[in-house]
Curated annotation (Swiss-Prot):
It comes from Debaryomyces hansenii (strain ATCC 36239 / CBS 767 / BCRC 21394 / JCM 1990 / NBRC 0083 / IGC 2968) (Yeast). This is Respiratory growth induced protein 1. The gene is RGI1. The keyword Transmembrane does not apply. One of its GO terms (cellular component) is plasma membrane. The keyword Aminoacyl-tRNA synthetase does not apply.
């Protein structure tokens, strides 16, 4: 995989995203994220949580996931996306002033469309961008009067053999949380890849 210059941006092409065919060594830059904790006379090394990047555009979010794979940091990243889902922008024809007060978590149609968008569009596009297999399975659902949250977790081997994961010590899990509220159609997506 080629690395892009900081000034140069590559357009996201979901049909031509490169697959991650084999694992590599953990980047040396990650050693700065390891902290030592002393407790009861012993010292334990702990990896700090990955720094969070904020996005307001799905394409920028997916490009970040692709770039983290290119940079060999696919197993240590945290991204937060706040956006209006495509089915909302399509319904209001791109004019956000036309958003109806019923376009939120209280509407069964909104919840159904959002769930369809997550499972049929967002997650498959994230998988294409990452270059490895994502298997989030069934979602855990938390609902309160003010918000609805889908929680997904993937602790699979991501399409790599256990031998290859052990050889490079690359074991990681993925967490994906998608939240909507009862006030507007804004959707919050929190994606985290954490080494285990």
């Amino acid at each position: 995989m080629t690395k892009k210059n900081k000034n140069q941006t590559l357009a996201l092409d979901l049909d031509n995203c490169e697959k991650l065919t084999q694992l590599k060594e953990i980047p040396k830059s990650r050693s700065s994220s390891i902290t030592s904790i002393e407790s009861e006379g012993s010292i334990q090394s702990v990896l700090k949580p990955p720094p969070m990047r904020e996005f307001e555009d799905v394409v920028a979010f997916e490009s970040y996931i692709r770039d983290e794979t290119w940079d060999n940091d696919f197993d240590y990243c945290h991204a937060h996306l706040s956006y209006y889902p495509p089915f909302i922008t399509k319904e209001v024809h791109g004019n956000m002033d036309k958003i109806k007060p019923t376009m939120n978590k209280k509407s069964r149609k909104f919840k159904r469309n959002l769930q369809h968008h997550i499972q049929k569009h967002l997650m498959p596009e994230m998988e294409k961008c990452s270059g490895f297999t994502m298997d989030f399975g069934k979602a855990g659902v938390e609902e309160t009067p003010t918000m609805l949250k889908w929680k997904f977790e993937d602790t699979s081997d991501h399409g790599f053999s256990k031998e290859e994961e052990n050889q490079f010590d690359r074991h990681w899990k993925l967490q994906l949380e998608v939240t909507c509220n009862n006030e507007n159609p804004l959707v919050e997506v929190d994606y985290m890849a954490i080494p285990i």
